[in-house]
Structure formats: structure tokens, C-alpha cells
Amino acid sequence: MIRQRTLKNSIRATGVGLHTGEKVYLTLRPAPANTGIIFRRVDLDPPVDIPGHALNVGDTRLSTCLSQGEARVYTVEHLLSAMAGLGIDNAFVEVSAPEVPIMDGSSGPFVFLIRSAGIEEQNALKRFIRIRKPVRVEEDDKWAAFEPFNGFKVGYTLHFDHPVFTEQNGFAELDFSSTSFVKEVSRARTFGFMRDIEMLRANRLALGGSLDNAILVDDYRILNEDGLRYQDEFVKHKILDAIGDLYLLGHSLIGAFKGHKSGHSLNNKLLRALLAQEDAWEEVTFDQASDSPIAYDRPGLAVAG
């Protein structure tokens, strides 16, 4: 059977929050089967647990924020993307501040942490959400959609009127039966425009942003001396974000996602629209690995196929 997964060991890291600029202590811990991904604010007294679920999403300005009462955890999407890419169903994520550390702006450091902790299969069937009917949400010229697909596929189109963004690097569609999340997506960094930085910081956002954890673009060019990690790193980061946002369904997805200029807000609207339309999805498990369109070859390397 395809089993649920958690971490073998706890592991710790330190970083800064992208928007708060605060130092953050992060601890990833194993969790029992059927727990899901639980974010825990250990700096609060008493600590507050916030399940990583679409219905707990509050603020979606520039990042995805989970909330429970007055407690918040911002910028969860890059860590969740790594959890999804490696097939981690259950974990406790402890943070000492209201934000997951940005690390290098990608999911790569989280992939490294999870692999370093080790991945353990649990004695429980892995639960998937399978898309049965198309679901679409729109805002002006932006849209996001789910379609039935026997596997996991993500397509995204971004558009900015800027010389750095071209048709060649503005669209990507990845079928994870033939694409490695770790190799082709996980290292794509978040990006931002210098012209927006002053406005963001005036609103106490992006206080921890730097060339060490983001691709920065002025009116003409990329400012990072080392350039891009992928030719299409911008759109691949949007795919990375979407994978993290989609994992707030609580389970791995069997289906196709397409986004056109969508962001965290529209992604969450799509999840809520899907969950509200009960005949558009179903929860499934697989007793035999050969029956599943998503295969996990061995702990540590999750491959859709």
C-alpha cells in the first residue's frame, strides 16, 4: 500500500522572516498518522497550534498566512511546497515568531532539512484528493482552475511588462510523472521589484528581504550577480508557490492545476471553491502502489508517475 509519511527525527534551523525581518527558530518534528501539517507558535503562552488547511488561511498579501484566533503564521508556502514534493503527510512545524524563515527564498533548504531528518513511512494509508470535475475562479484578467487528470500536473502563466520577462520564461507546465520537483522546481527563488521595495517597507513588509533570499529586478535587469538558477526561474517559483498553496487541501492532489497570473489569494479561493463543491472531488487511498497514479519510489524521493 502507499503509506503516509512523516519525519524520522526532529531537526532545527534558524533564519529570518521575509516580511517581519525577525530572527526565527524553526523546528520540524515527526507527527502521528492522520495528523496533517500542524504549525505551532511556541513563542506564545500557551503555544498555539494552527492546522495547515485552506480554511485557516487569512491574509494573502504577498504570502500565505494561517490564522487561529489572534495567532498568525505567515509565509508557509515554501515549506509546504517542500512537504508536498517529498510526500510528507504529517509533521509539527514549530516557529518562534509569526513567520516561517525565508531561508534562500526557495524550497531548497527545506528539502535539505527534511531529507536530513529522514523520512519514515507510517502504518496508515496515504490519503489523496482526486479532482472529479473542473473548478475555476476568476478575478479580472486572472484565473485559477482545477481539472481532472490521472497524475499531478501544474501549469502557470505570468506576465509583467518588463524586459526581463519574456514569452519564453513566462509559461511552464510540469507533469510530475516526468519532472523532478527537487531538481526542477525546489530551488526557484521568490522575486521582487526594486520599485516596490520602498512601498513594502513603509507598510512593514519585506523587512527581511535581500539579494540573499530573493531575485531582485530593477527597471531593466536582474540585480543578483549570480543570475538565475533556471532559465524560467520566475514562473517556476510561481509553480512552487502554487504547489505549497495546494497542499493546504491537507492531502496530495491527483489532478491538474492551471493558473494565469494567479497568486496566493486566488489560489486559496480556488481551494475553497473546490471544497464547497463536494461532487467535484473525492478522497481516495490505494492498497496497491501499482493502482496509484502518484508513485513514491522510496522515502526521500517523491515522484508522480
From Swiss-Prot:
Residues of the active site: 264
Keyword annotations: Hydrolase, Lipid A biosynthesis, Lipid biosynthesis, Lipid metabolism, Metal-binding, Zinc
Protein EC: 3.5.1.108
Reactions catalysed according to its record: a UDP-3-O-[(3R)-3-hydroxyacyl]-N-acetyl-alpha-D-glucosamine + H2O = a UDP-3-O-[(3R)-3-hydroxyacyl]-alpha-D-glucosamine + acetate
An example Gene Ontology molecular-function term: UDP-3-O-acyl-N-acetylglucosamine deacetylase activity
Record's keyword annotation contains Metal-binding: yes
Keyword Cell wall biogenesis/degradation: no
Pfam families xref list: LpxC
Domain of life, source organism: Bacteria
Residues engaged in binding Zn(2+): 78, 237, 241
InterPro entries the UniProt entry points to: Ribosomal_Su5_D2-typ_SF, UDP-acyl_GlcNac_deAcase, UDP-acyl_GlcNac_deAcase_C, UDP-acyl_N-AcGlcN_deAcase_N
Any GO CC annotation of this UniProt entry: membrane
Biological or metabolic pathway of the protein: Glycolipid biosynthesis; lipid IV(A) biosynthesis; lipid IV(A) from (3R)-3-hydroxytetradecanoyl-[acyl-carrier-protein] and UDP-N-acetyl-alpha-D-glucosamine: step 2/6
Cofactor: Zn(2+)
Any one GO biological process: lipid A biosynthetic process
Family that this chain belongs to: Belongs to the LpxC family.
Function per UniProt: Catalyzes the hydrolysis of UDP-3-O-myristoyl-N-acetylglucosamine to form UDP-3-O-myristoylglucosamine and acetate, the committed step in lipid A biosynthesis.
Protein name: UDP-3-O-acyl-N-acetylglucosamine deacetylase
Organism encoding this protein: Alkalilimnicola ehrlichii (strain ATCC BAA-1101 / DSM 17681 / MLHE-1)
Gene, per the UniProt record: lpxC
